[in-house]
């Protein structure tokens, strides 16, 4: 099967094009740094496989995710490259395009965001550009799918009759050095003359990954030639001279291809950015937007829908299942397991799906509109005081959905210590798995202020992440503050299709977890409540679950929720935070009183909020722990990532409850 790779700058629509060409769905967002590892999909019409590589501005990698690109181009086998560029930022995007052309591999150029360029008054004669580069160019709008069908039909012809032809003349002295380097590379390695020229150029540009691919003897010979030409070039470094020549080539190339509007008019983006990223009013605007989202999720739309679903699952659905089981003569043990264990456990989590969907919809709306990238800029000023940059906030925002991709997104951070710090604080971001716990408790104890209470927990998670990062960056992970440079994407009206796909995929993941982790956890919790030292079908107070819960309940007694029931729900929370709610449904609903009534009797508003603080901050779930181990390659850092949140949660909850108890 033929392999094709898709490459481009960050946030030019690579993943949108990948989704359009393969029919799959990978997470997309209107900001840079969304793709941090290569993704593989099967092209429609069995054309071949398409590999979506992380966005990069240059083939000299400076961050972990960018090494994936250079490593793939050097070591993997592929039939051709699809280089997608932003038509509204063509000159800057051509920097990477030129480097890819120097590979002298079959290549198509996808001219994306033609609609944005047109709105800005930018005119591009892509036919003329195609003739100059002798490379096929396809105008597309990846977000809507316009032009992608034609591109798909042409991909199978990529490479047919291809003849390597691209070459930039870097001047007599540098070209002589490149020639000598090529001779060494072809003699000492298996690379042909075109690959050798590319390697020589990248070596002169100080691409360290290229150097790592060569043996030490070849590196020493090439380094000697580089030092010689550096003396000949004079005061200007070889790299800077080559970049100057390359920039001149691009300017000449685009001179009669791109026409810009006569006036340098102030676009809508610039005007709105002055307000949304303002150092004084930007943050209040962000908090107000988040409040509106939570108000819609918990008061206006989400909760009423959840109440209807709860009534259906707890009433009509459960009664129907009982009737069917009685008709079929199912033994009492299985009846109890299915109704009191599986339906009660899994159903108690599924009732929050409407709230999850509403929240995900609005988060996707903010992402696709381009607003989230502005928040990263806004937060950069604040995060600098805590030893981080705005680049760390992008993975943190992703953590609002799930902490696992949040940790993986830290690959885009160049500074290794800042990357590690971001990984360690990412679990403090309140993921969607914690939302059912919040929804349950705010619906019982804080009916009039549900959105404010939930917002306060999200803000608390961010504050704790900042405070911990301060400690880490001043002690074991000292680093110099990195300069945060981010490309602000154009504001755009979100695509209904994109919003639907994004919301659907996230909600589907939540439901899928209900069918795996939560299902398994519910069965185990019910069995532990059903079995005890004295046999089966025991009173829950004589069960193994009561024994486990009593031990942990004793430990959290000073935190305000020291009952055995609360203690028992904390343990399976390590599996998945949603299991806390399913465990409560099984434990608290085992008696005659309903779940809500029992919780009201065992918690107060103060202890309920303390419980939510603890759930927010204590140990990450098992999937997050696995992601931390994978990204840090260290059991030491993984152990720290498990231990310190638990200590932090205990101390902060203890302080909150004990101080609050003095006034309430």
UniProtKB/Swiss-Prot annotation:
Q: Could you list the residue ranges that cross the membrane?
A: 281-301, 342-362, 382-402, 425-445, 452-472, 516-536, 544-564, 567-587, 608-628, 637-657
> Might you report a single GO cellular component term?
plasma membrane
Binding positions for GTP per the UniProt entry = 112-115, 141-143
Q: Which residues bind GTP 1?
A: 8-15
Keywords in alphabetical order, please: Cell membrane, GTP-binding, Ion transport, Iron, Iron transport, Membrane, Nucleotide-binding, Transmembrane, Transmembrane helix, Transport
Q: Where does GTP 3 bind?
A: 52-55
Membrane topology listed for this record? Multi-pass membrane protein
Where do the coiled-coil regions begin and end?
A: none
Subcellular location per the Swiss-Prot or TrEMBL entry: Cell membrane
List each copy of the FeoB-type G domain by range. 1-161
Kindly report the protein's main subcellular placement as a broad class: membrane
The question of whether rRNA processing is a record keyword is answered with: no
Q: Which residues bind GTP 2?
A: 33-37
Which superkingdom is the protein from? Bacteria
Looking up Pfam families in the UniProt record yields:
FeoB_C, FeoB_Cyto, FeoB_N, Gate
GO MF terms listed in the record are: ferrous iron transmembrane transporter activity; GTP binding
Which NCBIfam families does UniProt cross-reference here? Answer: feoB
Q: What does this protein do?
A: Probable transporter of a GTP-driven Fe(2+) uptake system.
Q: Which family does it belong to?
A: Belongs to the TRAFAC class TrmE-Era-EngA-EngB-Septin-like GTPase superfamily. FeoB GTPase (TC 9.A.8) family.
Record's protein name: Fe(2+) transporter FeoB
Tell me what organism the protein belongs to: Staphylococcus aureus (strain COL)
């Amino acid at each position: 099967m033929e392999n094709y790779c898709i490459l481009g700058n960050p946030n030019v629509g690579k993943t949108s094009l990948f989704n359009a060409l393969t029919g799959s769905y990978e997470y997309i967002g209107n900001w840079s740094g969304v793709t941090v590892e290569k993704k593989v999909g099967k092209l429609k019409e069995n054309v071949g496989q398409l590999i979506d590589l992380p966005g990069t501005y240059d083939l000299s990698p400076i961050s972990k995710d960018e090494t994936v690109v250079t490593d793939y181009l050097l070591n993997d086998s592929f039939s051709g490259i699809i280089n997608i560029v932003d038509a509204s930022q063509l000159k800057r995007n051509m920097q990477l395009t030129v480097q890819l052309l120097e590979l002298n591999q079959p290549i198509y150029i996808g001219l994306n965001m033609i609609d944005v360029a047109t709105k800005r008054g930018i005119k591009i004669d892509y036919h003329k550009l195609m003739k100059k580069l002798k490379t096929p160019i396809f105008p597309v709008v990846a977000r809507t799918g316009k032009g992608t069908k034609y591109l798909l039909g042409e991909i199978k012809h990529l490479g047919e009759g291809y003849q390597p032809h691209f070459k930039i003349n870097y001047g007599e002295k540098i070209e002589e050095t490149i020639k000598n380097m090529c001779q060494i590379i072809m003699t000492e390695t298996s690379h042909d003359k075109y690959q050798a020229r590319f390697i020589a150029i990248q070596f002169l540009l100080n691409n360290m990954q290229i150097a790592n691919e060569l043996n030490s003897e070849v590196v020493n010979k090439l380094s000697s030639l580089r030092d010689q030409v550096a003396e000949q070039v004079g005061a200007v470094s070889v790299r800077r001279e080559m970049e100057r020549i390359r920039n001149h080539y691009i300017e000449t190339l685009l001179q009669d291809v791109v026409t810009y509007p006569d006036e340098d008019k102030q676009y809508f983006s610039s005007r709105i950015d002055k307000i949304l990223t303002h150092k004084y009013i930007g943050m209040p605007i962000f908090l107000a937007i988040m409040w509106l989202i939570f108000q819609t999720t918990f008061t206006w739309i989400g909760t009423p829908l959840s109440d209807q679903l709860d009534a259906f699952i707890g009433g009509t659905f459960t009664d129907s299942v009982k009737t069917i089981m009685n008709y079929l003569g199912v033994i009492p043990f299985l009846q109890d397991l299915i109704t009191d264990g599986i339906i009660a456990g899994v159903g108690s989590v599924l009732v929050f799906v409407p709230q999850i969907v509403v929240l995900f919809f609005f988060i996707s709306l903010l992402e696709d509109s381009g607003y989230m990238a502005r928040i990263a800029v806004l937060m950069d000023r604040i995060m600098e005081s805590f030893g981080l940059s705005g680049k760390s906030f992008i993975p943190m925002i992703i953590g609002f959905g799930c902490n696992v991709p949040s940790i993986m997104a830290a690959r885009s951070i160049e500074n290794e210590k800042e990357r590690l710090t971001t990984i360690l604080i990412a679990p403090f971001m309140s993921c969607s798995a914690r939302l059912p716990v919040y929804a349950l408790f705010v619906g019982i104890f804080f009916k009039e202020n549900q959105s404010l209470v939930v917002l306060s927990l999200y803000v608390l998670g961010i504050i704790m992440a900042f405070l911990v990062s301060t400690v880490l960056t001043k002690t074991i992970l000292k680093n110099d503050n990195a300069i945060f440079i981010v490309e602000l994407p154009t504001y755009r009206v979100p695509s209904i299709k994109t919003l639907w796909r994004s919301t659907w995929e996230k909600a589907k993941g939540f439901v899928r977890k209900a069918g795996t982790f939560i299902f398994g956890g519910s069965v185990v919790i019910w069995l532990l409540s059903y079995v005890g030292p004295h046999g089966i079908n025991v009173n829950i107070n004589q069960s193994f679950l009561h024994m486990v819960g009593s031990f942990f309940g004793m430990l959290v007694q000073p935190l305000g929720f020291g009952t055995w029931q609360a203690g028992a729900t904390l343990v399976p929370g390590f599996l998945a935070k949603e299991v806390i709610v399913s465990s409560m449904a099984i434990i608290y609903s085992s008696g005659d009183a309903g779940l809500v009534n029992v919780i009201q009797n065992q918690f107060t508003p103060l202890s309920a909020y303390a419980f939510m603080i603890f759930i927010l901050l204590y140990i990450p779930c098992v999937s997050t722990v696995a992601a931390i181990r994978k990204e840090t390659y260290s059991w030491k850092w993984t152990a720290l990532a498990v231990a310190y949140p638990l200590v932090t949660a205990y101390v902060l909850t203890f302080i909150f409850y004990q101080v609050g108890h003095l006034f309430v």
